């Protein structure tokens, strides 16, 4: 559930909530990378991942587990370079879902880019603009 944990972090760390639009984007993103996801299996996985997030209690523990999850994804043979770029796109989609880009979202996404050694960059856009990947 490392992928789902990172998707959840992008959404939750910024404003301490996950609205329905963000949850739908998380589902669609997760579904692209994990075969056979149903609404029911997603809700089970999402519940377990949310519980893990809550159980970690502190932001520093949650951040440490985010780092751990990013490294686990990087080392997973299932994820090739192009897949990691697609995951970054999924993070950007989540950040854009609620029409407000939080600094924390930008920081978390840039952190993933750095850990995965991708030649990408993102910058917090001007008010009212969408977050975009710069190559």
Q: Language-model segments: what does each one mean?
A:
Residues 1-135:
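Small-residue-enriched hydrophobic alpha-helices in membranes
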């Amino acid at each position: 559930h490392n992928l789902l944990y990172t998707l959840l972090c992008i959404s939750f760390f910024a404003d301490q909530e996950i609205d329905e639009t963000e949850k739908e984007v998380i589902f669609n993103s997760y579904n692209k990378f994990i075969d056979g996801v149903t609404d029911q299996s997603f809700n089970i996985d999402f519940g377990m991942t949310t519980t893990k997030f809550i159980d970690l209690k502190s932001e520093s523990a949650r951040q440490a587990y985010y780092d751990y999850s990013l490294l686990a994804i990087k080392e997973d043979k299932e994820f090739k370079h192009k897949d990691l770029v697609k995951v970054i796109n999924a993070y950007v989609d989540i950040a854009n879902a609620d029409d407000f880009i939080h600094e924390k979202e930008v920081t978390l996404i840039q952190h993933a880019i750095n850990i995965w050694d991708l030649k990408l960059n993102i910058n917090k856009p001007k008010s009212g603009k969408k977050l975009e990947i710069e190559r």
